[in-house]
Structures are given as structure tokens and as C-alpha cells.
Amino acid sequence: MFYERSCFIFDLDGTLIDSLGVWSQVDQELMRRLSNGRVMLSEDEAGTLRIRAMKTYGEGSDAYLKYMADLKRAFDLPGTPEEIHFQRYSLAQEFLRTRVHYREGAAELIKYLKALGKKLAIVTTTRRRNIDVY
């Protein structure tokens, strides 16, 4: 089939690893903790808030600080946007270590292709520091 090819390129998130829902889970837990259980978002609600913020502010640290400021205002959360962002980052690192796993068959396929001497590449928009946690 494709095994005669010498190089394979894989997308990371959602293809090799099942990480797409983890960001909504991070935001759910962040809101629960910061509000002492007063704010309980569904995974869909958390995802919608984050996606809306990224569409409004773009990507990058500044966008996430603005997103944290929005959450602070909307839900009357304690702390500065910077403090909330730091807590989100810490929580995300924990979730990435403990909740993100290879998709079924992905690890075996990578090992098989490597054993065949194929060149492998991974592409992603994920920040390197998060990839290192996976």
C-alpha cells in the first residue's frame, strides 16, 4: 500500500494522540477550582468559550491572557489574568501528562515504520513545551 514510501508525515493532535478534548477539560477544572465549585461548565461550554476567544484574539500568550481576563470578568473569578493563566498552564501540564494517550494503533504503526527504516516526521501547531510533556 503506502509502505513503499520512504517518508511519512503525521499530524500530532487528534491523529497520533487523543488530545483534542483535553483543553476543554482543563478549562472545566480551572473554572471549578477558581470558583470553589460555583461554576460548572460542560466540556462543550468550555470549548465554545475557548474557541470564541481564540477567534477574537488570535493565538499566543497575549490571546490567552485576554481570554483569562474574559473568564475573570464573566464568572467573577479571583486573581489577576496572569495568575489565572499560570494556574491554567500548571493544570494543563498535569492533564497532558495524565490524560493524553496515543490513539489506538498509533504507537505500533510508528514503531513498525521506524523498524522498516522509514523517515518519520510529526507536524503540529502545539507548542514545543507541551509536546515535550506528551
Kindly give the residue locations of the regions a language model identified.
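N-terminal helical cap/lid subdomain that shapes the substrate entry/recognition surface
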Residues: 2-104, 112, 116
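Substrate-recognition element of Asp-dependent hydrolases with the DxDx(T/V) motif
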Residues: 87-88, 106-134
